[in-house]
Amino acid sequence: MYKIMISSIAIFLLVGCTSEKSISYKSNMFQSVSPQEAVLVQKGENKNFCVRCGMDLVKYYKTSHSAMHNDTLYQYCSIHCLQDHLNEGIVLKNPKVVDIDTLKFIDATKAYYVVGSQKNGTMSMISKYAFSKEADAKDFRDKFGGEIADFYKVLNITKKDFKHRR
């Protein structure tokens, strides 16, 4: 009996202590992509994580934004976290957003956003997805609802997330 218990504990420890060689991103979330599809623009050991909230940038890639401040390029999981950074009174330059069709970063000030679709948002109850082409934004809106807006209108909508935070 003693040998069986020791053997069982040893097997349990060996199985429980083995580590996977790679992280699996088998997410059914609309915002997610595979690590091979994601473009991470930050440098350093924490480049996979939102600079504001720490969320995984691959998992929330389709709502990812980036911007420059004092020669440092930051990447955010969402426009919510970009706005959170702006709330500190800093000036962010060259804002970019991921086009959910091409998965490439585009100029956020020229993007067509679909706000309030049936797809889940990131860091907000109101979803915000960006497109480089207005026709793509309209197709998405027709399938999933929402309204089309530009970057500045989306920033104003996002500011409401922080209304009760002070």
Predicted segments, located by residue:
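Beta-edge loop/turn motif
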Residues: D71-L82
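Short cysteine-rich clusters marking metal-coordination/redox-active sites
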Residues: C50-C53
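Short functional micro-motifs and their immediate structural scaffolds
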Residues: V58
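Residues immediately within or flanking Cys/His clusters that coordinate Zn2+
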Residues: K47
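Bacterial signal peptide processing site
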Residues: T18-E20
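Sec-dependent signal peptide recognition
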Residues: Y2-S8
